[in-house]
Design a protein with these regions (language model features):
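Canonical tetratricopeptide repeat
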Residues: 24, 57, 89, 122, ...
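Single-residue signature of alpha-solenoid repeat helices
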Residues: 6, 39, 71, 102, ...
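Short helix-capping/linker turns of helical repeat alpha-solenoids
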Residues: 16-18, 49-51, 81-84, 113-115, ...
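Hydrophobic/aromatic packing residues within the alpha-helices of TPR/SEL1-like helical repeat arrays
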Residues: 10, 43, 75, 106, ...
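Position-specific recognition of the canonical hydrophobic site in helix A of tetratricopeptide repeat
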Residues: 30, 63, 95, 128-129, ...
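Residue-level recognition of tetratricopeptide repeat
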Residues: 27, 60, 92, 125, ...
Length: 398
């Protein structure tokens, strides 16, 4: 929005905006490949002024540099301050710190030029499998392509895929799966069979052939079994992945429980994932808590259009404060329709191009008898694909 005037705008508010100007100036510099030291200095300044989102950004920078111990220091500060993205990353990293410490050790040797061939293979493989960074992994492993080292070939295939060379990438996935049943190649092939052909049985056979207990494979087996309507097996594999603190598997398991009408189990697993920093789990948990509140007093729920669950509202407030626009929109439903908070929350969500927020602002201004603004927001909502309904369609025509 600010384009080339962004720096000028943010500079006006340095030290005057509780770290907001510093935070967004740092983001702007990141997008334009600015000086890393300057970016870190701005984010450090933002944290000192109370902007807790900056902790996550600093942690993310150190993660990309493979400095995980340093990253965890900042992510912990963000977690302790209540920042949910920092919490998620901190908990995710915590499960992998043994691998990450080894990466730090080997990366130091690489930078010093003292790393052995086997250690270089180990480092590249860890960066690929535990950090999910095929670009960095390829830089480390490319010398081993000539010996058909599977992680090196896989990293190359991912880069080809990113360059829209799908056919070449799939040929490599087939090669390394045939070569040694490499689990990442198996996942690539299985996911294509599922998405493209709905061939769940063959996809499952490929995954079984890996004999892998990696959470990626366990969770995807659960997904396949769910699509095959074998819900007991789906639960078994989702649970195996969830037991390893895989948050995606927890969310899938929660969804499975919801479809099976096992709401108590869904609530528990969503709560576990939410406490580990999952925004989507928190959002789903809030829905369940609100539904349970309605069941306690259905007559009141029908009479009062404002949502009632205090627990759900508290969760949505936290998610909204973390910048989640869907939570902002849902949180607005906990206020009477003429309350100023309805306008404030939906404006924040609209700034993130949330189409429901555009519609809600149209309704808000309609109730305020502000024809110009209500029509403006209904028009924007409609232009962005939101169905505003026959009544407001007719209202726009007048």
């Amino acid at each position: 929005y600010l384009a080339e005037n962004g720096t000028m705008f943010f500079n006006k508010y340095m030290k005057k905006s509780k770290g907001i100007a510093e935070y967004y100036q740092a983001l702007l510099l990141q997008q334009t490949n600015g000086d890393e030291t300057q970016i870190l200095d701005l984010l450090e300044s933002a944290t000192k002024q109370g902007n807790i989102k900056a902790y996550y950004m600093i942690g993310n920078i150190y993660e990309n540099k493979l400095e995980f111990t340093k990253a965890q220091e900042y992510l912990k500060k963000g977690k302790d301050a209540g920042e949910i993205y920092a919490l998620y990353s901190y908990e995710y990293n915590k499960n992998l710190m043994n691998f990450y410490k080894r990466i730090e050790e080997l990366n130091k040797k690489l930078n010093e030029g003292t790393i052995s061939i086997e250690e270089k293979k180990e480092l590249g493989t860890l960066v690929l499998e535990k950090v999910s960074n095929p670009e960095k992994a390829y830089d480390i492993l490319k010398d081993f392509l000539s010996e058909n080292y599977s992680p090196a070939l896989y990293a190359k295939a991912k880069l080809l895929e990113n360059d829209d060379k799908e056919e070449e990438a799939v040929q490599i996935y087939n090669q390394i799966f045939s070569q040694n049943k490499y689990y990442l190649a198996a996942f690539e092939l299985a996911s294509r069979l599922v998405k493209g052909e709905k061939n769940y049985d063959l996809a499952l056979k490929i995954l079984e052939d890996t004999n892998s207990d990696e959470v990626l494979i366990l969770g995807y087996k659960g997904f396949i079994y769910e699509n095959l309507k074998d819900f007991a097996k789906a639960e078994e594999f989702y649970q195996k992945a969830a037991n390893k603190n895989d948050i995606d598997a927890m969310n899938y398991l929660g969804r499975l429980y919801e479809t099976q009408k096992e709401i108590k189990k869904a609530r528990n697993i969503y709560n576990k994932a939410y406490l580990l920093g999952s925004i989507s789990a928190g959002y789903k948990l809030a829905y369940i808590l609100e539904d349970l509140e309605k069941e306690k007093n259905p007559a009141k729920a029908e009479e009062d259009q404002v949502k009632q669950s205090k627990e759900a509202k508290k969760i949505l407030e936290r998610l909204a404060n973390s910048g989640d626009d869907y939570s902002m929109v849902d949180l607005s439903l906990y206020y009477p329709e003429t309350d100023k908070m309805v306008r404030t929350l939906n404006l924040k969500a609209a700034a993130k191009l949330n189409t429901t927020a555009f519609y809600n602002l149209g309704v808000y201004y309609y109730n305020q008898k502000n024809k110009q603004k209500s029509k403006f927001y209904f028009k924007v909502a409609k232009e962005n694909g939101y169905d505003i309904g026959e009544i407001f369609d007719a209202y726009l025509m007048n």
